[in-house]
Each structure stands twice: as C-alpha cells, then as structure tokens.
Amino acid sequence: MKHKFTILSAILIVALTACCLFACNDKGDSPAKVDYQSDNSYFVKTAESETALTFEPILDPVYSESGLTYKQVDYRFGVIFYVGTAIEPKYYEYLGNALAKQGYLVVMPKVTLNMTYAYYKAQEEAFSAYPNVKFFVAGHSQGGGAALRRASENADTVAGAILLSPLCYRHKLLDADGNPVKDEESGVDKYIIDNLKDVDVATLLVEAEQDHVLSDEMKADAKTRLKEGYVHKVISPAAHMSFSTMDNDEILKSFNNDGDGITEAQKQSQRTKTVEYILNFVKGLSN
C-alpha cells in the first residue's frame, strides 16, 4: 500500500511539474502587450520584401547560427507611410525605427518609380496583411497626398492621418470596373478632389517653414481639404525634402536655384521634431 502511494505521489508530482512548465512556457511565448502611453524601447526588426519595407517592434532578440529568435510584441497600432516623389523608403528609416521602438508596426509600401500617388492602389495591402492592427496613414509630399486620399476612402478603417508637407492632387472618378466616369453632358472625365472635411479622421499636418518645393497656393490648397480642428505644426528652419534623409541638394536645385539653404544640423533637428510631433499625435489616439 505504501509502495502504491509512493508511485501515485511521484506521478502527481511529475504531472504538476509538467503543467507548471507548460503554463510558464505558454506565458513566455504569448506576445507582450504594448502600453502606448509609456516611453517604450522595443528592439526593431527591419524586413524588406518586393512590396514594402517593414519595421516591427520585438523583444529579447537572440542572434545565432540558426538565425534570429525573439519574443513577439502584440502591437495593436501601426503606421502606413507613403514615400515622397522619387524617394526610396530607406530614406525614412529614422522615422520607421523611432515609431517601431515605441510599439508601432510601420509599413512603407514600395511603388513604381517611388511615385506613390501616380501608382496609387485601390486596396492597401497592409490592411489585409495585418487585420488586427489599426493603422494611421501617413506620407510625405506626394505620399502625403496619397495618405489624404487613403484616409478619405477608408475613413472607417484608419486611426488617423499624418501629412508631412503634402502635395495634393485630384484624380479621375472610376466606376466599379475601374473605368473613368464621364460627365453626361460634356462627355469629359469626372474628377474627385480628395478631402477630409466631411469625415471624422483625426489629422496631423506638419509643414516646413523654408519649403521651396510647394508653392503658397499648394500649401493653402492642402489646408482647404482638412476638417476644422486638425493639429497643425510648422517646423523652422526646415526644408521640404528634409523630412527624408536623402542627399537632396541636386534635387532641390531643380526646383529652385539655391536649394533650401538648410544646414545638416537643422535637417537633423527637423527630423527629431517630426518624430516628436508624430509620436505625441499617435499616442494620444492609441487607446
């Protein structure tokens, strides 16, 4: 009898130990929750595919011969960032890293010739790729115009819009088959002017004081497309192209003779303030 009791006790101890180990491992493997109101410091995993450059927050990365292992993060919010005209996503890495460090998944879609608005896609792939993530849509220059358009077309889906010196356009009205809709009387293609005036989308507009790329008319036009109460920040000194880290002097000279006249230190300060303004904006809406 005593022998049977000893065996039963041993079996019970083994079973309890196994359950405990399973519970511990299960807890360890479950994604870490993000407190978006805290000043976080996640590691950032950068991945590049044919369609996007992605910045993912992770924990406890371990590099070995077999590759990278890490603890997953349960990020509930993200930022889709559309690039400026002819600027590759890699030139916005500073922004992707800063946002991912705070717990946001950042996706920078790749488009033909880096012309986001010209090659605008009717469906945003990140929405279906990450169905559990609530995305802010953001962009710079032409990409800002694309972000405004995305926000207007997907107002019920996005968490907010972030526009960095946006270059806004109008585009053709298309039918369900993707064909241009024509005016019944004139036969001319109908156009849509994207705007957020009549939709409930929180919006941040950040402008560069020394912007020699956008005209005053272009800047004014962007503001007319926004709903009253949007958050507006102006950085000075700051240049249009310096929201990216691309060496831009030659590009700027094609728009104006002397470039923007902004020093490297001032460009870095502009980008630091850009990160600060965006984080303050998204953290206030990440509930």
Predicted regions and their residues:
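Short alpha-helix in the alpha/beta-hydrolase fold that links the catalytic acid
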Residues: 95, 201, 214-224, 247
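Conserved alpha/beta-hydrolase
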Residues: 96-116
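N-terminal cap/lid segment of alpha/beta-hydrolase-fold proteins
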Residues: 27-74
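Gly/Ala-rich beta-loop-alpha elbow adjacent to hydrolase catalytic centers
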Residues: 138-147
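C-terminal motif of bacterial Sec signal peptides marking the signal peptidase cleavage site
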Residues: 19-23
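Short beta-strand/loop motif that positions the catalytic acidic residue
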Residues: 199, 205-207
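Short beta-strand element of the alpha/beta-hydrolase
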Residues: 75-84
